[in-house]
Amino acid sequence: MTANAQQLQFIKDSIETIPDYPKPGVLFRDITTLLDNPLAYQATIDLLVERYQGKGITKIVGTEARGFLFGAPVALRLGVGFIPVRKAGKLPRETLSETYNLEYGTDTLEMHKDSVRENDKVLVIDDLLATGGTVEATVRLIRRLGGEVSEAAFIIGLLGLGGVERLQRQGVSSFTLLEFPDH
């Protein structure tokens, strides 16, 4: 097993699976146990930094709230700015908004209008890719400001829920450290 494969297995083992949460039949992947393990958390950040070092990234965008936990330390290590994308009404300056569909309704994300500039090369980081609705709205915000989305990175990808395909339809490549079945 390579060093990276060992790190990935260590990270995967640090994520607890909670059956029947938030509803029966769902296996919830709980990253709080990864965050509580400083060695696993550090290994996660290290692998992301290793992947994106020297790739010309100028900004990292993290989506509320768990995207902040991974995006900000990677941005710090890469020496680039970190941009939070938040739920509507949480940012103090002038914002752009994108509304997207959820299973039972809609939600709205916002980012500051001056956070991404024309030709910024942006990496989106979030904890989990499932259906891809949140990241799709985030990509639309970045593009409306003139930024180029270089890739979207996730700690966990849930297979079979269509998130990767949704990003591909937008012309965005994705990267996941770990993949789990969708159930």
UniProtKB/Swiss-Prot annotation:
Keywords from the named record: Cytoplasm, Glycosyltransferase, Purine salvage, Transferase
GO terms classed as biological process: adenine salvage; AMP salvage; purine ribonucleoside salvage
One GO CC term on file: cytoplasm
SUPFAM superfamilies: PRTase-like (SSF53271)
GO molecular function list: adenine binding; adenine phosphoribosyltransferase activity; AMP binding
Chief subcellular location: cytoplasm
Keyword Phosphoprotein among record annotations: no
Protein's UniProt keywords contain Glycosyltransferase: yes
Protein's cellular compartments: Cytoplasm
Gene3D superfamilies: 3.40.50.2020
Highest rank taxon of the organism: Bacteria
Metabolic or biological pathway: Purine metabolism; AMP biosynthesis via salvage pathway; AMP from adenine: step 1/1
Description of how the protein assembles with itself and partners: Homodimer.
PANTHER family: ADENINE PHOSPHORIBOSYLTRANSFERASE
Function recorded in the entry: Catalyzes a salvage reaction resulting in the formation of AMP, that is energically less costly than de novo synthesis.
Family: Belongs to the purine/pyrimidine phosphoribosyltransferase family.
Protein name as catalogued: Adenine phosphoribosyltransferase
Organism: Photorhabdus laumondii subsp. laumondii (strain DSM 15139 / CIP 105565 / TT01)
